[in-house]
A protein has these predicted regions:
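Amphipathic alpha-helical interaction surfaces in cytosolic regulatory modules
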Residues: 24-97
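Short acidic-hydrophobic, aromatic-tinged amphipathic segments that line or gate anion-handling sites
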Residues: 99-103
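Short beta-strand/loop segment at the start of cytosolic alpha/beta domains
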Residues: 1-17
Length: 103
């Protein structure tokens, strides 16, 4: 499956839907979606990872990038995180900087 990062907005929330594998080759596309989400001025960023099948270290760095790019008062929620992806996020210790809802 090809990687897809799709941004939608509404009601003060920017949602980025991720599908496929988030790795070094695809992280720049996710960075672009994060920049676009920040530009909306949304008070909440939702990252829908329900179709994300794999996350590499570059994907983890992209999550850190997201946390650094948004304002401190913006909530970032990871929703629909699959067990394999959640395991990697937890092993990296990134589960404390985000509101995470597993699938």
């Amino acid at each position: 499956m090809a990687f897809i990062a799709t941004l939608s907005t509404g009601s003060g929330t920017a949602t980025i839907r991720l599908a496929g594998e988030l790795d070094a080759a695809t992280a720049p596309e996710f960075h672009d979606a994060i920049d676009d989400a920040v530009a909306t001025g949304a008070a909440r960023l939702v990252i829908d990872a329900s179709e994300l099948t794999y996350i590499a270290s570059a994907g983890l760095r992209a999550l850190v990038f997201a946390r650094q790019k948004v304002a401190e008062d913006v909530t970032i929620s990871l929703v629909g995180v699959t067990e394999p992806v959640l395991k990697v996020i937890k092993m990296a210790g990134l589960d404390h900087g985000f509101d995470i809802t597993a699938s």
